[in-house]
Curated annotation (Swiss-Prot):
SMART domains: S4
Protein's recorded name: Tyrosine--tRNA ligase
Gene behind this protein: tyrS
Keyword match Cytoplasm: yes
Source superkingdom: Bacteria
Organism (species): Dechloromonas aromatica (strain RCB)
Residue ranges annotated as motif 'HIGH' region: 42-51
Family annotation (HAMAP family): Tyr_tRNA_synth_type1
Length: 424
């Protein structure tokens, strides 16, 4: 049992992998408001689902009265963290990284409050590394790191023992940069806690050691467990790729559907990780689901809570509406924005010219039929619908009010096979 209700809650949720000095941190959190940080390197133009847990940890700490710092790695993003990566990262240009930094800041900011006694801070480590020269780095930072200790890190050893992949000095020096981030944030803002994924443990410990050496301060690290799925497949990925927090890369509808498809074996764990529902409430939901003997409610609750957190209430309502319309066949209730989400990533689709296209050709073009002969068979069997209305004429040409908002037509074969035509 922990004294700090926050640490106890994180423990109960299964969100703690390691803490550098658990007893001292637990005591400190019960005595005062602390400043903590988490770093986010711009490795793409959006954060993905794996970043959501640490973002929510910052939010949990702030709601408990502590002061969070979201550090965007404008400098470290130019290097690339080698931790447990099989190959060296591609180096992106400064202009690309600067663009990504701006986008990531915009994604993190809505989760935090930037006013009040424990107002959050957005920082960029390029602010202190950008003007530092090589001699300063080697003299003031490098002398505090033992190469012997660095080489022993598991993440480095994995690269050194691979015959086809070594590790460059650039990536090898990454932990020095991350370590100095902690020391600099301690000096500037009194930051005493760094959080990160379990793969960051070595870098975080390097930061606690460097801060002690440079500033004689006792600071802490807390790592979060690797998010795994019961079936062994990678979390946060679908057949079409990663689940992004940017709605332009993963629509709110696709985001919502991702959570709806969570397995029974994972759903309660993910409710603890990705929602602010009390642990006791999640246990009640699990007990009710198991007692009911029917379809669990947990997936719907998780999908609603997570979508609301990331995309807001309006986007959640749209995701629910799209889901219900496709289930009921009442496609007339879909808005133009709903159809744009489906065209983005919610449904297999095809772009066609507005030219009196026949239904048979449309079925083939959309992938709902392998050939014109098969398309005719589907139509004759009564299994084809246009915007939810059964289509029976073999010579039917799609047009008029079948072009929803003048832009879209939804074809259905059977009960579950959809194709969305975007008319050009």
């Amino acid at each position: 049992m922990y004294q700090s209700p926050l640490i106890q809650d994180l423990h109960d949720r299964g969100l703690i992998a390691q803490i550098t000095d658990a007893a001292a941190l637990d005591k400190l959190l019960t005595e005062e408001s602390v400043t903590l940080y988490c770093g986010f390197d711009p490795t793409a133009d959006s954060l993905h689902l794996g970043h959501l847990v640490p973002v929510l940890i910052l939010k949990r700490f702030q709601e408990a009265g502590h002061k969070p710092i979201a550090l965007v790695g404008g400098a470290t993003g130019m290097i690339g963290d080698p931790s447990f990566k099989a190959t060296e990262r591609k180096l992106n240009t400064p202009d690309v990284i600067a663009s990504w930094v701006g986008k990531i800041r915009g994604q993190v900011e809505p989760f935090l409050k930037f006013d009040g006694a424990n107002a959050a801070i957005m920082a960029n480590n390029y602010d202190w590394f950008g003007g530092m020269n090589c001699l300063e780095f080697m003299r003031d930072i490098g002398k505090h790191f033992s190469v012997n200790a660095m080489i022993k890190k598991e993440s480095v050893q994995q690269r050194l023992t691979r015959e086809d992949q070594g590790i460059s000095y650039t990536e090898f020096s990454y932990s020095l940069l991350q370590g100095y981030d902690f020391a600099e944030l301690n000096k500037r803002y009194g930051c005493v806690l760094q959080i990160g994924g379990s793969d960051q443990w070595g870098n975080i410990v390097a930061g606690t050691d460097l801060t002690r050496r440079l500033h004689q301060k006792h600071v802490f690290g807390l790592t979060l467990p690797l998010i795994t799925k019961a079936d062994g497949t990678k979390f946060g990925k679908t057949e079409s790729g990663a689940i992004w927090l940017d709605p332009k890369k993963t629509s709110p509808y696709a985001f919502y559907q991702f959570w709806l498809n969570t397995s029974d074996a994972d759903v309660y764990k993910f409710m603890n990780f990705f929602t602010f529902l009390p642990v006791a409430r999640i246990a009640e939901i699990e007990a009710a689901d198991k007692a009911s003997g029917t379809k669990p409610e947990a997936q719907r609750i998780l999908a609603e809570e997570a979508t609301r957190l990331v995309h807001g209430e309006v986007a959640l309502m749209a995701a629910r509406r799209i889901t219900e319309c496709l289930f009921s066949g009442q496609l007339a209730d879909l808005t133009e924005n709903d159809l744009e989400q489906l065209a983005q990533d919610g449904m297999p689709g095809v772009q066609l010219e507005k030219s009196n296209t026949g239904l048979i050709d449309a079925l083939v073009a959309s992938g709902l039929a392998k050939s014109k002969s098969e398309a005719r068979t589907f139509i004759q069997s009564g299994s084809v619908a246009i915007n939810g209305n059964k289509a029976e004429a073999l010579d039917h040409a799609i047009g008029g009010d079948e072009l929803l908002y003048g832009r879209f037509t939804i074809l259905r074969r059977g009960k579950k096979n959809y194709g969305l035509i975007s008319w050009q």
